[in-house]
Swiss-Prot record:
GO terms for molecular function: small ribosomal subunit rRNA binding; structural constituent of ribosome. This is Small ribosomal subunit protein bS20. The lineage of its organism: Bacteria, Pseudomonadati, Verrucomicrobiota, Verrucomicrobiia, Verrucomicrobiales. SUPFAM superfamilies: Ribosomal protein S20. GO terms for biological process: translation. It comes from the Bacteria. Residues 1-26 are annotated as: Disordered. The keyword Acetylation does not apply.
Length: 87
């Protein structure tokens, strides 16, 4: 257990950040699955709508630092590529 005030504060901060990051990561996984499901059904409109939501969430996660910027770009690129194949 931590002995100093600053160490106790860091523990509290880490717990808060971990919870927030977990929630954001879970949301991203769900949105990725929605995009994949829309692509699977070959519904281009639904896929585009799901992609817009997913893209926005990924950008926000990267901006805050939950995921690295390159990973965000990779996620968006793969999703866009899958949607482009629907045509």
């Amino acid at each position: 257990m931590a002995n100093t005030k600053s160490a106790l504060k860091r523990i509290r901060q880490t717990a808060t950040r971990t919870a927030r990051n977990r929630a954001v990561t879970s949301k991203l996984k769900t949105l990725r699955k929605k995009v994949a499901a829309a692509v699977e059904t070959s519904d281009k409109e639904a896929a585009a709508a799901a992609y817009n939501t997913f893209s926005s969430a990924v950008d926000k996660a990267a901006k805050v630092g939950t995921i690295p910027a390159n990973r965000a770009a990779n996620y968006k690129s793969k999703a866009a590529k899958a949607i482009a194949k629907i045509a």
